[in-house]
């Protein structure tokens, strides 16, 4: 990636990390108290960009940082099981510009936010990879992947300087196994041309994103090759499914 593009991606990531995404949980039920405690949310709506209004049936999400306000079904679960489902549903309702800030401020949201960032970038790169212009896709895809890696880093609370950003990209965006991924794709993808390129673009982005998430969850420990192979295999399966849906729309 050129220095100009690198600086642009770095600046965008810094700006995203500076947003505010304070979350409030309202309601008088024991369920509201439990959810607020699980999320680490405040109980007052004052200054909140995300508001979860709890009721017996579920929750209603609204606020400045919410792109898709409305009802969120509340699973009949407790503790971690409730948290895992609720965070995914909240994240899917959020404005993309506030995701990094939400994860940075509220650790329970980190996994769901980083998965959403990964999938968003993978979908974009799959569409770019399907364009019939050889070589024109690489600068855009590379910039998307760099942005994804740095946004995941910011979501985990990394204070990014330009030097730190370069270091992370060298460690996480390089050598994650694109050649191995391409070899696996030949065996698993039953179609060629633009569709195969789109699958590899999607899967490569997902594999990079998932390995980056694990890197930060494990305190800076890189994923081993055996585990990376499994990540690539699953990413290819997801990529194949996504591109199959694209092909049906064309």
Predicted regions and their residues:
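Terminal, membrane-proximal amphipathic helices
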Residues: 1-127, 151-164, 203-250
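Membrane-inserting effector segments that mediate pore formation, membrane fusion
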Residues: 116-210
């Amino acid at each position: 990636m050129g220095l100009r593009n690198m600086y642009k991606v770095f600046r965008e990531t810094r700006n995203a990390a500076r947003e505010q995404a304070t979350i409030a949980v309202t309601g008088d039920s024991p369920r509201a108290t439990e959810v607020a405690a699980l999320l680490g949310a405040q109980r007052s709506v004052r200054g909140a960009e995300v508001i979860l209004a709890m009721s017996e049936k579920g929750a209603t999400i609204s606020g400045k940082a919410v792109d898709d306000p409305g009802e969120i079904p509340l699973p009949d679960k407790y503790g971690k099981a409730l948290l895992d489902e609720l965070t995914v549903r909240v994240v899917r309702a959020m404005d993309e510009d506030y995701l990094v800030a939400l994860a940075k401020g509220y650790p329970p949201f980190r996994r769901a936010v980083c998965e959403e960032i990964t999938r968003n970038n993978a979908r974009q790169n799959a569409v770019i990879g399907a364009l019939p212009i050889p070589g024109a896709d690489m600068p855009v895809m590379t910039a998307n992947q760099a942005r994804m890696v740095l946004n995941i880093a910011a979501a985990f609370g990394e204070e990014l300087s330009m030097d730190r950003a370069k270091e992370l990209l060298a460690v996480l965006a390089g050598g994650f196994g694109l050649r191995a991924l391409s070899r696996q794709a030949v065996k698993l993808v039953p179609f060629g041309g633009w569709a195969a390129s789109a699958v590899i673009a999607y899967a490569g982005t997902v594999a990079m994103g998932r390995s980056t998430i694990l890197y930060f969850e494990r305190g800076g420990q890189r994923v081993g090759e055996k585990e990376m192979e499994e990540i690539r295999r699953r990413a290819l399966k997801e990529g194949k499914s996504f591109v199959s849906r694209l092909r049906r729309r064309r």
